[in-house]
Amino acid sequence: MRLDDEPENALVVSSSPKTVVASGNVKYKGVVQQQNGHWGAQIYADHKRIWLGTFKSADEAATAYDSASIKLRSFDANSHRNFPWSTITLNEPDFQNCYTTETVLNMIRDGSYQHKFRDFLRIRSQIVASINIGGPKQARGEVNQESDKCFSCTQLFQKELTPSDVGKLNRLVIPKKYAVKYMPFISADQSEKEEGEIVGSVEDVEVVFYDRAMRQWKFRYCYWKSSQSFVFTRGWNSFVKEKNLKEKDVIAFYTCDVPNNVKTLEGQRKNFLMIDVHCFSDNGSVVAEEVSMTVHDSSVQVKKTENLVSSMLEDKETKSEENKGGFMLFGVRIECP
């Protein structure tokens, strides 16, 4: 909980971050003990010190530092954490992708970060539990009879991955008939450099998809004149690695319409695109999801996860923090060994 602002110079030039030793000989980066007994949090980025606020405990200040480091030091966030990643904090990068760096820092300073992160997790788990995957013949906008809070995702097309799709070229070729019909319009009258880097008057777009876990994926979509193909480039390699994609796996693309009575994530439209993976099995078949399968009906685990998140993220700020053997992290009591 943030108590007050730094009196002066919230952003000043300095050389190296400070480390504080809290109770139990635990060292926290970016935490400064103050004369009034409270704890300040700060982080260094581009050789500048950014003030994050004042907190009641060193643990809260250290947590604020970890959250800020995700946005400011995403390239090596693992090297700058006070606490190990958990099943809860692993969702922070996705949450922060919805906001600018300035907005994330302001939320940390004004004390609203943890509340908005909690809301993000709850809304996302509710969306996952409401998705109804439909086949290509399902009518777009069809009303689900089981619940008006479910929304259907209609398949646009699918593609079996080739060796080059998951190889060193770091690109996915979209078949022309699907690219023209379903993807945003881009001009095919372009010149390009080697390795697909386009120069001159270029038209390429960033397309945004969500997977089944409602994690956002952004791909650069453009036209390669040399091979006369429509491709996903930037962002595709990360998706391949994260999903451990192999040759003959199938990628399916969907369009999803969200009813007005269902909340969406920050910045997410009521109509969005979804990307799903059907893995190729050892027996030579593709393990696909059943048509019209509702996720929350087929997966009790999703509901359990939603209940767990709600339980773990209950607001306990008014409760005592007298337990000397632990600390509070996003409303959860973490016991120290």
Curated annotation (Swiss-Prot):
<dbReference type="InterPro" id="IPR003340">
    <property type="entry name" value="B3_DNA-bd"/>
</dbReference>
<dbReference type="InterPro" id="IPR001471">
    <property type="entry name" value="AP2/ERF_dom"/>
</dbReference>
<feature type="DNA-binding region" description="AP2/ERF">
    <location>
        <begin position="27"/>
        <end position="84"/>
    </location>
</feature>
<comment type="function">
    <text>Probably acts as a transcriptional activator. Binds to the GCC-box pathogenesis-related promoter element. May be involved in the regulation of gene expression by stress factors and by components of stress signal transduction pathways.</text>
</comment>
<comment type="similarity">
    <text>Belongs to the AP2/ERF transcription factor family. RAV subfamily.</text>
</comment>
<keyword id="KW-0539">Nucleus</keyword>
<keyword id="KW-0238">DNA-binding</keyword>
<dbReference type="GO" id="GO:0003677">
    <property type="term" value="F:DNA binding"/>
</dbReference>
<keyword id="KW-0805">Transcription regulation</keyword>
<feature type="DNA-binding region" description="TF-B3">
    <location>
        <begin position="157"/>
        <end position="271"/>
    </location>
</feature>
<protein>
    <recommendedName>
        <fullName>AP2/ERF and B3 domain-containing transcription factor At1g50680</fullName>
    </recommendedName>
</protein>
<dbReference type="GO" id="GO:0003700">
    <property type="term" value="F:DNA-binding transcription factor activity"/>
</dbReference>
<keyword id="KW-0936">Ethylene signaling pathway</keyword>
<keyword id="KW-0804">Transcription</keyword>
<dbReference type="GO" id="GO:0005634">
    <property type="term" value="C:nucleus"/>
</dbReference>
<dbReference type="GO" id="GO:0009873">
    <property type="term" value="P:ethylene-activated signaling pathway"/>
</dbReference>
<dbReference type="InterPro" id="IPR016177">
    <property type="entry name" value="DNA-bd_dom_sf"/>
</dbReference>
<dbReference type="InterPro" id="IPR036955">
    <property type="entry name" value="AP2/ERF_dom_sf"/>
</dbReference>
<keyword id="KW-0010">Activator</keyword>
<dbReference type="InterPro" id="IPR015300">
    <property type="entry name" value="DNA-bd_pseudobarrel_sf"/>
</dbReference>
<dbReference type="InterPro" id="IPR044800">
    <property type="entry name" value="LEC2-like"/>
</dbReference>
<dbReference type="Pfam" id="PF02362">
    <property type="entry name" value="B3"/>
</dbReference>
